[in-house]
């Protein structure tokens, strides 16, 4: 289907790649699945999560710890939200799921936002998003 839904998706992924600076972009149906796939890949394919747990903020959406568990890992809650400013080397509106290379970037979508070697999960739905698709 050269001009069907697959072409639209491919064009969208390419535009996201160019905008964010990521070499690869994969679109999925929602943020929960993006987190699950990224954590599963980190845990089962790359085997980067050696001790079997991932930290996340105590105050987050319920889907975040659920996807950590769903990917075969254990959750450790923390007070550290990891949402500092870029001058300090961290991202405002995003946080790293500790002990992994996965970022929950649900509230951040900016040009050249990609951090090399990470899996940055971005969401386009919800009331606080910068780029609304729904």
Regions picked out by a protein language model, each given a short descriptive name:
Residues 1-33, 41:
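Conserved N-terminal alpha-helix of the aminotransferase class I/II PLP-enzyme fold
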Residues 22, 31-32, 79-82, 126:
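Short, acidic/glycine-rich phosphate-metal binding loop used to engage nucleotide
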Residues 28, 57, 123:
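Conserved residues at the C-terminal ends of beta-strands
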Residues 87-134:
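Conserved active-site segment immediately N-terminal to the catalytic lysine
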